[in-house]
């Protein structure tokens, strides 16, 4: 969802009503919230989140936080996004109550406003989540529009493609399909493929798109979805829940 003329403080308060990655994932998250920003001072964003995480309020925060760099992202104004993840929907609610009542959250929000401006926000639910994405060092993300009625059939075809390429060695780490629950004015779903680093990621992508399994996948999903953008996402830092 595009943020047009809204107050940065209002937006960032929502970050903590709604929240991982680069933390070790021992359980699955039930939802993730992405807050896309145009960052002018990356070090300032990291510092603001560092201080909040170290505070008494941050120590009680029931979610995982991470900062991702959208290294290559087409024409979008977004340069980074904060990903906030929860193990339960109750954690989502509790985080909102906590951060609206603690002064450390207000301090952090003020610091973030000095280092970034909002671009868009969205909440997602995982449909497919294979392997531990929190340990990966690079991702290719494909944003797309798809009718909900085609989701199950697409998910089956995507899983078949991924499983085939895991066997061939071109997919070596995490992959997934996510549905946008809120903020789907631009895209309704996205898929991602992760790898340990950029070289491994791009080598695998070349092999995948030239495989017979990809040809079969393309035939199966023709007309089901429209790919709108492909982006390179690099993890920057994570602040795991205590």
What are the residue ranges of the model-derived segments?
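Short, Lys/Arg-enriched N-terminal segments with co-localized hydrophobic residues
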Residues: 1-7
């Amino acid at each position: 969802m595009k943020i047009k003329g809204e107050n940065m403080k209002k937006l960032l308060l929502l970050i903590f009503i709604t929240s991982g990655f680069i933390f070790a994932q021992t359980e699955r998250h039930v939802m993730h919230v992405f807050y896309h920003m145009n960052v002018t001072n990356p070090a300032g964003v990291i510092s603001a989140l560092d201080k909040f995480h170290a505070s008494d309020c941050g120590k009680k925060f029931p979610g995982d936080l991470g900062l991702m760099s959208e290294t290559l992202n087409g024409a979008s104004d977004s340069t980074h996004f904060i990903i906030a993840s929860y193990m339960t929907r109750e954690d989502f609610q509790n985080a909102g109550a906590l951060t609206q009542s603690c002064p450390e959250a207000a301090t952090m929000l003020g610091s973030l406003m000095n280092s970034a401006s909002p671009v868009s926000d969205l909440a997602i639910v995982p449909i497919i989540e294979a392997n531990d994405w929190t340990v990966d060092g690079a991702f290719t993300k494909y944003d797309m529009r798809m009718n909900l009625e085609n989701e199950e059939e697409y998910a089956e075809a995507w899983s078949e493609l991924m499983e085939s390429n895991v066997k061939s060695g071109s997919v070596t780490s995490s992959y997934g399909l996510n549905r946008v629950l809120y903020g789907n004015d631009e895209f309704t779903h996205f898929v991602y493929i992760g790898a340990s680093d950029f070289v491994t990621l791009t080598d695998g992508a070349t092999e995948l798109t030239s495989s017979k399994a990809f040809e079969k996948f393309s035939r199966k999903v023709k007309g089901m979805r429209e790919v709108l953008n492909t982006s390179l996402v690099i993890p920057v830092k994570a602040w795991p829940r205590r």
